[in-house]
From Swiss-Prot:
Belongs to the PsbE/PsbF family. This b-type cytochrome is tightly associated with the reaction center of photosystem II (PSII). PSII is a light-driven water:plastoquinone oxidoreductase that uses light energy to abstract electrons from H(2)O, generating O(2) and a proton gradient subsequently used for ATP formation. It consists of a core antenna complex that captures photons, and an electron transfer chain that converts photonic excitation into a charge separation. It is a single-pass membrane protein. Its cofactor is heme b. Pfam families: Cytochrom_B559, Cytochrom_B559a. Heterodimer of an alpha subunit and a beta subunit. PSII is composed of 1 copy each of membrane proteins PsbA, PsbB, PsbC, PsbD, PsbE, PsbF, PsbH, PsbI, PsbJ, PsbK, PsbL, PsbM, PsbT, PsbX, PsbY, PsbZ, Psb30/Ycf12, at least 3 peripheral proteins of the oxygen-evolving complex and a large number of cofactors. It forms dimeric complexes. It is found in: Plastid, Chloroplast thylakoid membrane. With its partner (PsbF) binds heme. PSII binds additional chlorophylls, carotenoids and specific lipids. This is Cytochrome b559 subunit alpha. One of its GO terms (biological process) is photosynthetic electron transport chain. HAMAP family: PSII_PsbE.
Length: 83
């Protein structure tokens, strides 16, 4: 037996003025906030990833590849000491 749950249909929601008033403000605000988060470099600081100019320093020019199958921890320690 099917019945109504009392919820508005999706078509009703997206055709209402209230929906578009709310979302015409929130969607661009989220886009601008994300753009500022990345462009100011705060994303690098929050997630701890190196900035593009910090991947290769003067003291560390090689690519940190792990080549040993049986001693990866020793290689990781060596890479982390070079930071």
């Amino acid at each position: 037996m099917s019945g109504s749950t009392g919820e508005r249909s999706f078509a009703d929601i997206i055709t209402s003025i209230r929906y578009w008033v709310i979302h015409s403000i929130t969607i661009p605000s989220l886009f601008i906030a994300g753009w500022l988060f990345v462009s100011t470099g705060l994303a690098y600081d929050v997630f701890g990833s190196p900035r593009p100019n910090e991947y290769f320093t003067e003291s560390r020019q090689g690519i940190p590849l792990i080549t040993g199958r049986f001693d990866p921890l020793a290689q990781l320690d060596e890479f982390s000491r070079s930071f």
